[in-house]
UniProtKB/Swiss-Prot annotation:
Organism of this sequence: Pectobacterium atrosepticum (strain SCRI 1043 / ATCC BAA-672)
UniProt protein name: Thiazole synthase
Lineage, broadest ranks: Bacteria, Pseudomonadati, Pseudomonadota, Gammaproteobacteria, Enterobacterales
Catalytic residues, chain numbering: 95 (schiff-base intermediate with dxp)
Family the entry assigns: Belongs to the ThiG family.
Main localization category: cytoplasm
Enzyme Commission designation: 2.8.1.10
Length: 261
């Protein structure tokens, strides 16, 4: 179970709507993923309330929408986009994204914290995309964010958990859910994040650009379930020396003694 604010989700896998070849393929992949919370950029939404090829089918699947402020370069732009999303979609949930750097899409920590504080005051349930900075994540928690979404690697890079050491600190210190966002390129990366103690992961590119997005979505679903179950089960401690699972010393001595007789 993933508990965010006043909502309990049975899936720890969050997904996105970008980069899919067709809306139909996107919907099939999202359904296969089992995800219950899907993020989407406001620029993809039909603000006139007409027949939206993406929005309406998502709602029919019972998926909770998480609009994001992708494209915002400042706190003011993000707050404006958030208000627009709440008006257009009727939700106070928001994935806060502010990345002025168009090459690496790295989040602006100063503007993100500023916007988060304002949006929380306005009643939004804020899930900020941020760098894997333990101090920043703690500050975002303190201003009232419902979860933090530190990056594993740059958006869409498929590099996996390049920020592993910092993610461990964030997870250890957090009193709100930690959802690893960006850079997860394989189901094994997702399982690794859950085994580490992350509460969830958000995956988009790795599913959308796969040769078979539906199969990849299913693979991520299984990986997230496996990683979460492994964490709950409790993994054995690492050690630098061997530890035999089936000691044979006594058996060999018995055989030797029998032969001597």
């Amino acid at each position: 179970m993933l508990h965010i604010a006043d909502t309990i989700l049975t899936s720890r896998l969050l997904t996105g709507t970008g980069k899919f070849a067709t809306p139909e393929l996107m919907l099939a992949a999202l359904e296969a993923s089992g995800s219950q919370l899907v993020t989407m950029a406001m620029k993809r939404v039909d603000l006139n309330g007409g027949n939206d090829a993406i929005l309406a089918p998502l709602r029919q699947l019972g998926i909770k929408l998480l609009p994001n402020t992708s494209g915002a370069k400042t706190a003011d732009e993000a707050v404006f986009a958030a208000r627009l999303a709440r008006e257009a979609l009727g939700t106070h949930w928001l994935k806060l994204e502010i990345h002025p750097d168009v090459k690496y899409l790295l989040p602006d920590p100063i503007e993100t914290l500023k916007a988060a504080e304002q949006l929380v005051k306005e009643g939004f349930t804020v899930l900020p995309y941020c760098g894997a900075d333990p101090v920043l994540c703690k500050r975002l928690e303190e201003v009232g964010c419902a979860a933090v979404m530190p990056l594993g690697a740059p958006i869409g890079s498929n590099q996996g958990l390049q920020t592993r050491d910092f993610l461990r600190i964030i997870i250890e210190q957090a009193r709100i859910p930690v959802i690893v966002d960006a850079g997860i390129g394989a189901p094994s990366h997702a399982a690794d994040a859950l085994e580490m103690g992350a509460d969830g992961v958000l995956v988009n590119t790795a599913i959308a650009v796969a040769r078979d997005p539906v199969a990849m979505a299913r693979a991520f679903r299984l990986a997230v379930n496996a990683g979460g179950l492994a964490r709950q089960a409790g993994q054995g401690n690492k050690q630098f020396v061997a530890s035999a699972t089936s000691p044979l010393t006594g058996f060999l001595h018995q055989q030797t003694e029998g032969a001597e007789r």
